[in-house]
Design a protein with these regions (language model features):
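Terminal alpha-helical segments
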Residues: 1-167
Length: 167
């Protein structure tokens, strides 16, 4: 008969949330720049929009927006209001909603500080999620350099927020 005591229970494994806006923004930026430098402008442009979306959502989360179970922007507006959460959108509507519904951001002062580092964020006014379906000749190719500049500003903003300990 063995007198060994039972093994201690294993500590629960902590699984990080699936949604990681900052990491996604950086991944999309790396891929967008690779595509841009090889002349694949249509897909680079699409990814620059995703950089903007993910970077801005990372900032909003850092400024107090409560995450859903996956770690992302929740699907519903905070109580007592009802309906879809205004920050659960793509650019350019996301940028419009940040301005129009600014009161839902718990730390608006901090959000303003970092948004000021992205003066060209409204250059995504003609970016559409639906561009992914369009013919190359129908895309606003002339806007891609503007989107690139704004996406670079967003990654620089993320760098600053990270350096400041906000992200």
């Amino acid at each position: 008969m063995s007198t060994a005591s039972p093994a201690p229970a294993a500590a629960p494994v902590s699984v990080p949330p699936r949604v990681a806006y900052e990491l996604a923004a950086r991944r999309h930026m790396t891929d967008a720049e690779t595509l841009f430098t090889t002349g694949r402008l249509a897909n680079a442009g699409q990814l620059y929009g995703f950089v903007a979306e993910c970077g801005l959502k990372a900032l909003m989360m850092a400024c107090g927006i409560q995450a859903d179970a996956d770690g992302g922007i929740p699907g519903k507006r905070p109580a007592p209001t009802k309906g879809k959460h205004p920050l659960r959108e793509h650019v350019p509507l996301l940028m419009t909603n940040i301005t129009a519904d600014f009161q839902i951001i718990p730390d608006g002062i901090q959000a303003n500080k970092y948004l000021a580092l992205v003066p060209n964020r409204n250059d995504f006014h003609d970016w559409l999620i639906d561009h992914r379906y369009w013919r190359d000749t129908a895309l606003p190719i002339a806007s891609i350099n503007l989107w690139r500049v704004a996406a670079r500003e967003i990654t620089t903003m993320l760098d600053q927020a990270k350096q400041d300990g906000v992200l």
